[in-house]
Amino acid sequence: MADTGTEKLVIIAAGGTGGHMFPARAFADEMRARGWNTALISDSRGLRYAADFPADWKEEIEAASPNFRKPWTVPGAALKINAGIARARRLMKQHRPALVAGFGGYPAFPALAAARRLGVPIIIHEQNAVLGRVNRQFAKHAQLVASGFERLDRLPRGSAHMVIGNPVRAPIIAAGQVPFPPTDGTLNIFITGGSQGSRIIGEIVPLAIANHVAPPLRVRLKVVQQVREEQFESVSNLYRSAGIECELAAFFGDMPERLAAAHLVIARSGAGTVSELATVGRPSILIPLAIAMDDHQAANAEALTAIGAADMILETNATPKLLGELISARLSDGADLTARAAAAKSAARPDAAQKLAEMAERIAEL
């Protein structure tokens, strides 16, 4: 049912967090550079990340994630999902896409279901090292399942699978050209909790640095940290009382520059974060989100820990003392830091968006 016009359309279906939206955006940028029209289907949460998403049109549809532990909520969720599928079908009949690209998250379900029913080719991109629930349901029906990491758990047998990496934004790729900073002066620590912030990182990391890094090293530190607004005052007071230069914000709009300036990054291990660390080439300490579905953040972290580019501390083990000792060990050895940066860079896949776009075009032409 592809459009017979000169410009083909790809509809992008993505969930309601930055982890799904950012790679979808990088893919959309690449497809538009190749002359394609792009459209975005998501729910209200997803569209909050899409103010400047490169799309000819964007559509908010009904979506839900049924909670079978609360069976009384399932009928309402089913009604929302069916309404979303019906709306997605109408849109596809109207706009006649050549392809639907799913980037995971439950808001992607209605568009993928509609595409399957209408016979529109489907490609799926899985950012994490564990295939998500929505992508899992459509993997065997997709012409391609592209993955962000070599490891991809829970992939159904018979699925067409290819490792391409996670598409990252052009400014991140540009930051990857910045050399690792010298380690004989100020040491920059960049601390981020991902697109939704992290209360635990905001509590534990400042205590680790202020109380468990020795003064001779502590005076050389500059800390740049993403914190929630309600934590701003307490974190600021803690750093300043310990004599540590700090810069705090709820969100950093210049993330590529912050990563490039860092000697050490402390972060969650969402797929986007891990891929950006590799692209820029910076050593890290990763604290996976314990409640992540299928423990996928711990699986993601292994892409860097296995090659000596990162350390991983599970939330259950993340005490200020342990973290402070690890920070001290890493920052005290400049040669080791530099080697870890090079190891991270070796895992980079800066051409992921191009590879995914190439496969999308091939599949659309079949």
Curated annotation (Swiss-Prot):
Molecular function per GO: UDP-N-acetyl-D-glucosamine:N-acetylmuramoyl-L-alanyl-D-glutamyl-meso-2,6-diaminopimelyl-D-alanyl-D-alanine-diphosphoundecaprenol 4-beta-N-acetylglucosaminlytransferase activity; undecaprenyldiphospho-muramoylpentapeptide beta-N-acetylglucosaminyltransferase activity
Localization: Cell inner membrane
InterPro entries hit by this protein: GlcNAc_MurG, Glyco_trans_28_C, GlycoTrans_28_N
Entry membrane topology: Peripheral membrane protein
UniProt record, GO biological process: carbohydrate metabolic process; cell division; cell wall organization; lipid glycosylation; peptidoglycan biosynthetic process; regulation of cell shape
Similarity comment: family membership: Belongs to the glycosyltransferase 28 family. MurG subfamily.
Stated name of the protein: UDP-N-acetylglucosamine--N-acetylmuramyl-(pentapeptide) pyrophosphoryl-undecaprenol N-acetylglucosamine transferase
Species this chain originates from: Hyphomonas neptunium (strain ATCC 15444)
Source species taxonomy: Bacteria, Pseudomonadati, Pseudomonadota, Alphaproteobacteria, Hyphomonadales
